Amino acid sequence: MNDKGVYQEKYTKANFITRRLIDGFFKATGELIAGLDVRTAVEFGCGEGVSTRRISRLLPTGAVFEASDFDERLVQAAQALNPNIRCAKESLYELHRADNSFDLVVVLEVLEHLENPDRALREICRVARKWVILSVPREPVWRLMNLARLKYVTSLGNTPGHVRHWSSRTFRRFVGLYGVVREWRTPLPWTIVLLDVGE
C-alpha cells in the first residue's frame, strides 16, 4: 500500500480538469451509496483523510463512520482533517475488527497497490455485514491518460506503486468471487463497484 501520496496529490495539486474528474468520481460513489441502509461504515486505506471527508458527506445522516490506514503518519493527518471521525492504524491484511462489523465498507484506490489483493478482499468481506464499495483505476484508460499528459512515460503510463491492473470487466469478475456485484460505475478513468456480501 505504498505510494498513497501519489493518489492524494490528485486532491492537493489538482488542476481544473482533474478536479472535475474527481468530482465525477465521488458523484458516482454517492450514487452507489444512495438508498443503502447504512448505520455503520468504515473506509479502509483512507490515506490523508481527504476521501474520508468526501465519503462522510455521502452517508445517511446519523451513520457512524470510521476510517483507517496502515501508515501512522497518514492516520494522524486523516484524524487532523476529520476530528469527528475515529481514525485508526491497521493493515488490510489483518483488520482489527469483528466479523460483520459494518453495514458498508469503502476501499478506494487501494487494491491496485497490493501484492495480495485476494487476501485483503477476504478481510474486507469478513468485516462487512452487507455492502462493500471498491474502486480501482480503469485500465488501459488510466495509463493512456497518463501517457497523453506525458506522465510516467518510461513505465508506459503506469503510476508508481500500481502493481495490479484491471479493466472494468476483469475487476468485476475478480470481486464477484467474493460477493454479488449489484451495481457499478465507470467515471473516467475509474471503475467503482457495489458488492453485496450479505447473501
Where in the sequence are the language-model features?
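Conserved N-terminal segment of class I S-adenosyl-L-methionine
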Residues: M1-A98, D118-L121, A148-L150, T154-E199
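Hydrophobic adenine-recognition pocket in adenosine-nucleotide-binding enzymes
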Residues: V110
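Conserved beta-strand signature within the Rossmann-like core of class I S-adenosyl-L-methionine
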Residues: R129-P137
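A conserved beta-strand element that flanks and buttresses the S-adenosyl-L-methionine
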Residues: V106
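Histidine-centered divalent metal-coordination motifs
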Residues: H113
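Short "lid" loop at the C-terminus of a central beta-strand within the Rossmann-like core
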Residues: R138-W142
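A short helix->loop->beta-strand "cap" motif at the edges of active sites that frequently abuts
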Residues: G62-A63, A128-K130
